A protein has these predicted regions:
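Short hydrophobic alpha-helices and adjacent helix-cap/hinge residues
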Residues: 27-329
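Bacterial N-terminal signal peptides
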Residues: 11-22
Length: 329
């Protein structure tokens, strides 16, 4: 079984060569063919974990090729559309038996406009919060949606912070963060507390906003991906100087900048998608496979930021929470 990867970031010449069929001689033909289309890029922790789950579960069942849309870094709408067209060209030329996708942009720019209710089977994963906005499921598409433990996390924050009334949400200027923010706004309204927010485009803006957010009871840390000038060490250096309030996140890769995390397990998405693809390869009808939400989650603690913040966490959380180690990407 072969594994190959092409990224939009390497230029579309590489894609055209792939479509033309000029593949390395080491790749062996397989009875079944799987294409994995990631919305993002290698090195983005969430995407890497989904990929790992996919690769582990389809291994031995099909020849796997991968295309990375790179839409976090190449995030102009026209660039994303070009990436989607490049993925489409691979599908039309190589004719995979099943296509697995990760995250929203692969659905929005590839599946919905070109393959809705067509013949090619698609298994999506990492789709934020709901599939309804894309009219899913289709006759040829099913998958797993990604639901963050928002309510559980906010309830936990309320149990830690006395007289919790005001929170601040800080994230990046991206489509996925707009969707995440809306979920927190709904949850905040349901629980009767004020939620202010900022979606920013630079690390300086992020740090300035974070410092100002210390006037709130709780700071909710959204995704930083989409902020191109992010410098991990600089951000951490500033955070340890300014943090005075509890910060929470549902993104594992944001734990180097956050006190407490209740996070999704990205690998779960890839494992489910890979296993589902294998079922389809074995003849199971995709129309009988329902769209499902993720179920797994982890609790994380950043002891370094906790120690300088003055925040006290309950002993139960301190015992059960995993301590971060090299999660920043």
């Amino acid at each position: 079984m072969g594994f190959q990867r092409v990224s939009a970031h390497t230029g579309f010449l590489a894609v055209s060569l792939l479509v033309a069929g000029t593949m390395p001689a080491t790749v062996q033909a397989a009875d079944k063919k799987c294409l994995f289309v990631s919305s993002y890029h290698k090195g983005y922790a969430h995407a890497d974990q989904i990929e790992a789950g996919v690769r582990e579960t389809v291994k031995g069942h099909c020849e796997l090729r991968q295309f990375d849309m790179d839409s976090k870094r190449r995030n102009a709408k026209e660039d994303i559309k070009k990436s989607a067209l490049a993925a489409k060209a691979i599908i039309e030329s190589w004719k995979p038996d099943v296509v697995i996708t990760a995250d929203d942009n692969a659905v929005k720019y590839l599946i919905e406009p070109f393959y809705r209710n067509k013949n090619t089977p698609f298994v999506f994963s990492g789709l934020n919060w709901t599939a309804a906005e894309y009219g899913l499921p289709y006759s040829n598409a099913t998958g797993m949606i990604e639901v963050g433990p928002v309510g559980v996390m906010l309830d936990r924050a309320a149990s830690i912070v006395p007289r919790f009334r005001r929170a601040f949400y800080l994230g990046s200027k991206t489509l996925s963060e707009e969707k995440n923010l809306k979920r927190f706004q709904v949850a905040a309204a349901k629980r009767g507390f004020v939620l202010d927010h900022a979606l920013v485009g630079s690390s300086n803006e992020w740090l300035k906003t974070y410092a100002g957010a210390q006037e709130y009871d709780v700071v909710i840390i959204g995704n930083r991906h989409g902020i191109e000038d992010w410098n991990e060490q600089n951000v951490i250096g500033e955070i340890v100087k300014t943090t005075r309030k509890l910060s929470v996140t549902n993104h594992g890769w944001m734990m180097p900048y956050t006190i407490l995390g209740m996070t999704k397990v990205s690998r779960e998405q890839g494992e489910w998608a890979g296993k589902t693809a294998v079922r389809i390869l074995n003849g199971y009808k995709i129309s009988k496979i329902p769209v499902v939400p993720n179920r797994q989650r982890d609790v994380w603690i950043n002891s370094k930021i906790l120690a300088v913040s003055g925040v006290k966490l309950p002993q139960g959380i301190m015992r059960k929470g995993k301590k971060i180690a090299g999660l920043a990407r």
